[in-house]
Amino acid sequence: MSSNPDQSTEVLYSVDSYVATITLNAPERLNTISGRMLDELSAALLKANSDMSVRCIILTGAGRAFCAGLDLAAQMSGPKDSLGNMGNIGASAGEFDIRNAPPVVLHNIDTPVICALNGGAAGYGLDLAFGCDI
């Protein structure tokens, strides 16, 4: 089974020969994690885990880095909350469900995940790498 990746997202998903490949797709910013990427990554991991034809997941990054951590530029330009905290990574505390965070999803899925490090992994990117099985 094979499916073509959707190029309009920050996370690419494809399946070929029982292997799902999930690619962080923001090479121009070294695949730094945005709120949108968090949501798309969790959704892709859950999709692969629920697909009975997928026996293994490969997590990788596009370009010259795996993931350089959180997108601090977006955080600095985002709105400030009432406590002065900056950023737009994820939703407000009342709306964000930690059970949907990619490291938690990685810990809870049954399908083995291989991290294909194609370059640097820093901060949150290192958390993602450590969350993989291999």
PLM segments and residue spans:
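Conserved CoA-thioester-binding segment of acyl-CoA-metabolizing enzymes
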Residues: 1-62, 78
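Glycine- (often His-adjacent) and acidic-residue-rich active-site loop
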Residues: 5, 61-105, 121
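Small-residue (primarily alanine) positions within well-ordered alpha-helices
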Residues: 20, 44, 48, 68, ...
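Hydrophobic/aromatic residues within transmembrane alpha-helices
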Residues: 22, 59, 71, 128-130
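Histidine-centered beta-alpha loop that forms part of the nucleotide-sugar donor binding/catalytic region
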Residues: 25, 70, 118
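Glycine-rich beta-to-alpha active-site loop
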Residues: 102-134
